[in-house]
Amino acid sequence: MNRRDFLKGGVIAATAMPMAGLAAVKEPENDGKAQYETDVLVVGGGPAGVCAAIAAARNGAKVLVVEQSGMLGGMATQGLVGPFMTCYDKAGEKMIIRGLFEEIVNRLVARGGALHPKGVFGNGPYSAWIPKGHDHVTPFDPEELKVLLDEMCAEAGVKVLLHTTFVEPVVKDGRAVGAKLFGKGGYKCVAAKIVIDATGDGDYAYRAGVPCVLGDGNGRLMPATMFFRVCNIDSEKLIADIEANKHTFHKKDGVSYRGFHWYVTKAIEAGEWDLPRRCLNMYRGVGQDVWLVNNGRIPGVDATDAESLSHAEVEGRHQTKVMMDFLRKYVPGCKDAILMCTGSTVGIRETRHVSGEAMLKVDDVINGVVPEDSVFLAANSVDVHGGKNNPMVSSYQTINANWYGVSYRCLVAKGVENLLLAGRCLSGEPAAAGAVRVMPPCMAMGQAAGTAAALCLKVGTTPRALEGKMLVKTLAAQGAFLG
């Protein structure tokens, strides 16, 4: 049975097996009672969600964050996605994504869990020798990040519910007022004054009836990637091989030929490489001989669909096996390489784009437009994978200015009151979202959404009616760089 047959049979059929001795789990009666009451409900504990929760709590709100896995951090911890992409301006001179993101980086650095981006440059091992757009990335240890995020939520007084799945929104008279959840104890209801959708997929907004676009709107989504970590490598030999050959890096018809493409060609000829890639990108980690591999491409994945996501997980592990065999056979310094771990969830670049009161447009990103109510500035390039229906093709466009801004109104969901967005599901054109989908901008969005929610409660208004100047002033006072 191959991996695709396994998905068609074993995984799906298992759900139909009878289970003796289990009592039926009943939904709570719709009697208006809630097991939890909170000011701000954050749905999703990834990079955006955890920053939203901490920011809201630090600004005086009672906060509950709901996370379906057993840890906070989302793609950064579960998915092993790293490093944090650049947080600097285009010139590489100034750190512009600051606030909570900078605090997290500094606290990780202080405990040996990260390298500060000021000392990390493109075209070197910490950036997979990619020069364009990869200055000042932040290598970090996901295990240290897990613990740090737990600590920061506890310090802020955030209530965290792990192993708890969002089931459906509770919307009354056009207002988000809570959610139905499911966890080990069965169904629970939570009542909230403001909800922040930080699910990445826009699950709350979509189920609440907010208009959404899936992928590019024509059925195409960026490919997924299974990240994995490797150790027991002779880093000196690996680095020497790359340095001796990096002058051959090139791009042809949108396909990148970067790290170890000279060996990938040999592996293809030998029938030992069936992956939709022509290179292998390795990022040096915080540990001396620990490396992170961001290389697989799994096309056609709709992460809003469980069957499609299941396929991606299985295919991602297959691709990891192919790459590990390749490393041990072909790459200098890797003959005794050890696979430390694969992500506990596959890395997802794109699903739904939720409609908001404003839309981030790709032309504004490229041309450095800074709206008056910008809640963060960024210089991340427009990075779209999987163009021309080919998972190997990528489009990477740097911006024409030193930075651009993202309007607060891109985080205010359209048509449902008291609902904010944070993370890659923000309101934006698909290509524009391709710039801010990476983790530093998502964390800045989270801080902005959480701060906005707390301010709304303080002054007695809704997110839609909140004065942008008040939010911008508060964010700047709390460490955000806004020009």
Where are these regions (language model features)?
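Aromatic pocket-lining residues of Rossmann-like dinucleotide-binding sites
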Residues: 56
